[in-house]
C-alpha cells in the first residue's frame, strides 16, 4: 500500500507538514485553526490522504472540493490559506496526553515509514511550541 486516507487534519509550516491525529472531538480542527492563525497553511481538515514516496510521507486533501476549507464549530466552514500537499515531518496525537516535561523521542509508523510523534502536552503554549518545532526542529 502506498497511500491511505486517515481521520486526521494536516497543516504545513514552511513546507514542513504536521499530521494532527486523534479521536473525534479531541481538538484536531481547533489545533489546525490555531496554527493557521499563527501562519501555517491548511493541507486538509478531518480527512487526510497520506502517500508514501520512497522514504517520504506526503499529505494531501483527498477531496479537491474541500481544499482550503476548515470547520470552526459555532462559526461554520471557513476558508483558509492552503497548500495542495506537504511532506510530513511530525505528527501529534491529540488523544494521548504527554505527562513528561522533557519527553523521549517517539515515532509512529505510517505506511511502513516512521514519522516523529509528539503527544498532546495540554498547556497553553503548545501551538506556539509546535510552530517553532516545525520551523527549527527539536534539540532534546
Predicted regions and their residues:
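Short solvent-exposed loop/turn micro-motifs enriched in small/polar/acidic residues
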Residues: 2-4, 43, 85, 100-101
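Short, acidic/polar N-cap/turn motifs at the starts of alpha helices
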Residues: 8-10, 47, 105
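Short acidic-glycine loop/turn motifs at beta-strand connectors
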Residues: 14-15, 51-56, 111
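Conserved nucleotide-sensing/catalytic segment adjacent to the nucleotide-binding pocket
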Residues: 37, 41-96
Amino acid at each position: 500500500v502506498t497511500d491511505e486516507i486517515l481521520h486526521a487534519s494536516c497543516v504545513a509550516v514552511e513546507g514542513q507538514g504536521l499530521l494532527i491525529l486523534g479521536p473525534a472531538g479531541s481538538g484536531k480542527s481547533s489545533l489546525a485553526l490555531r496554527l493557521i492563525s499563527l501562519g501555517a497553511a491548511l493541507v486538509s481538515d478531518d480527512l487526510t490522504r497520506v502517500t508514501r514516496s520512497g522514504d517520504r510521507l506526503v499529505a494531501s486533501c483527498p477531496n479537491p472540493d474541500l481544499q482550503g476549507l476548515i470547520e470552526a464549530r459555532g462559526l461554520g466552514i471557513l476558508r483558509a490559506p492552503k497548500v495542495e500537499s506537504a511532506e510530513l515531518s511530525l505528527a501529534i496525537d491529540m488523544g494521548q496526553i504527554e505527562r513528561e516535561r522533557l519527553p523521549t523521542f517517539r515515532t509512529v509508523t505510517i505506511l511502513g515509514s516512521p514519522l516523529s510523534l509528539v503527544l498532546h502536552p495540554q498547556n497553553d503554549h503548545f501551538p506556539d511550541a509546535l510552530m517553532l518545532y516545525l520551523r527549527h526542529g527539536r534539540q532534546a
